[in-house]
UniProtKB/Swiss-Prot annotation:
Location within or outside the cell: Cytoplasm
Molecular function GO terms recorded: acetylserotonin O-methyltransferase activity; O-methyltransferase activity; protein dimerization activity; S-adenosylmethionine-dependent methyltransferase activity
Expressed in which tissues: Expressed in leaves, stems and flowers.
Reactions it catalyzes: N-acetylserotonin + S-adenosyl-L-methionine = melatonin + S-adenosyl-L-homocysteine + H(+)
Keyword annotations: Cytoplasm, Melatonin biosynthesis, Methyltransferase, S-adenosyl-L-methionine, Transferase
Induction note: By senescence, abscisic acid (ABA), acifluorfen, salt and cadmium. Induced by copper. Induced by butafenacil. Induced in dark-grown etiolated shoot. Induced by UV-C.
Name under which the protein is recorded: Acetylserotonin O-methyltransferase 1
UniProt cross-references to InterPro entries, sorted A to Z: COMT-like (IPR016461), O_MeTrfase_dom (IPR001077), Plant_O-MeTrfase_dimerisation (IPR012967), SAM-dependent_MTases_sf (IPR029063), WH-like_DNA-bd_sf (IPR036388), WH_DNA-bd_sf (IPR036390)
Quaternary structure note: Homodimer.
Pathway: Aromatic compound metabolism; melatonin biosynthesis; melatonin from serotonin: step 1/2
Aminoacyl-tRNA synthetase found in the keyword field: no
Family according to the record: Belongs to the class I-like SAM-binding methyltransferase superfamily. Cation-independent O-methyltransferase family.
Influence of temperature on activity: Optimum temperature is 55 degrees Celsius.
């Protein structure tokens, strides 16, 4: 057997060997794209381009963000990676090259800049030292018995992700701002493509709804729906005032306010199977009967469901490994079905309108 393996290695062509090396190094250095994106976000390069009339040279960018002149050549190298990655577009003319925004970098414009949506805080949620450091503990987490008993995040930091968010105001503010951004984008898409999921509803509780971005979007589109947000007391205490939304501090494992519909956006993927069953049972206690419009609406990844394009499919799997750091998981349909049935629900429908994520309607 060993001899056959050696023979197969020996017959690898020169081109195969070369391509294998290139692919391996490409995987190893893929993190550079993430770090370059984070740097561009923190430097507010998208803002600089936007404020310069939508097109900016390296000199323009350096002046706007306050770079030292010695860093101009380094900025060119950074922008070269980001243009190849599709974050910006470069236009080579007779003079100095100019950079413009793409649909991706338009999402990185800051609050003070005219924009429809922004996801700059989500970039910081994904690409930050706390999250990245957790991934360096993967080997220990897989192989050391003591480490395997806790989350990947706990191995790296000695506390859970949620404890750090609660105790570190700067980290907590960044995380919650990111969730607001993500919810705003997701709800805009849902209300454009599948607003029917909210029609005929009189009342809705958004469980784990944070500062109320989802509920606010629902109320704007359907003013007659009575919306409540349930989250931990220290979260709702910081929620912005909204006369159309009631904020309730509490624990989703203990009590969920009664409503026609309970909505959970990206909550269950943070929990293991048994806890998800408990949460869904609480949801079932809270909602109306099915013939009265009662249902649970989940916004979650269903691995293998959605777009057939490579990037969304890969994103589902990347999300799944990323969620290991909180001991979370992205589930396939059969895993979701098992949770629903064990919690006492009769049926469900998957609506794959979010590319990577789906709407799941679950019926009592």
């Amino acid at each position: 057997m060993a001899q056959n393996v050696q023979e197969n290695e020996q017959v690898m062509s020169t081109e195969d060997l070369l391509q294998a090396q290139i692919e391996l190094y490409h995987h190893c250095l893929a993190f550079i794209k993430s770090m370059a994106l984070r740097a561009a976000t923190d430097l507010r390069i998208p803002d600089a381009i936007h404020c310069n009339g939508g097109a900016a040279t390296l000199t323009d960018l350096a002046a706007h963000v306050g770079l030292h002149p010695t860093k101009l050549s380094h900025l060119r190298r950074l922008m070269r990676v980001l243009t190849l990655s599709g974050i910006f577009t470069v236009h080579d003319g007779d003079g100095e090259a100019t950079y413009t925004l793409t649909r991706v970098s338009r999402l990185l414009l800051s609050d003070g800049v005219e924009r429809t949506h922004g996801l700059s805080q989500m970039v910081r949620v994904f690409v930050n030292p706390v999250a990245v450091a957790s991934q360096f503990s993967l080997h220990e987490w897989f192989t050391v018995e003591k480490a395997a008993a806790v989350s990947l995040f706990e191995v790296a930091h000695g506390c859970t992700r949620w404890e750090m968010i609660a105790n570190d105001s700067k980290d907590g503010s960044m995380f919650n701002a990111g969730m607001v951004e993500d919810s705003s984008v997701a709800m805009d898409i849902i209300l454009r493509k599948s607003s029917n999921v909210f029609r005929g509803i009189n009342s809705l509780v958004d469980v784990g709804g944070g500062y109320g971005a989802v509920a606010a979007a629902v109320v704007r589109a359907f003013p007659d729906i009575k919306c409540t947000v349930l989250d931990l007391p220290h979260i709702v205490a910081k929620a912005p005032s909204n006369n159309n939304i009631q904020f309730v501090g509490g624990d989703l494992f203990e009590f969920i306010p009664a409503a026609d519909v309970v909505l959970l956006k990206c909550i269950l993927h943070c929990w293991q199977h048994d806890d998800c069953v408990k949460i869904m049972r609480r949801c079932k206690e809270a909602i109306s009967a099915r013939d009265a419009g009662g249902k649970v609406i989940l916004i979650e990844v269903v691995v293998g469901i959605g777009s057939n394009e490579t990037v969304p499919k890969e994103m589902q799997l990347l999300f799944d490994v990323f969620m290991m750091y909180t001991d979370g998981i992205e589930r396939e349909e059969h895993e979701w079905k098992k949770i629903f049935l064990e919690a006492g629900f009769s049926d469900y429908k998957i609506i794959p309108v979010l590319g990577v994520r789906s709407i799941i309607e679950v019926y009592p």
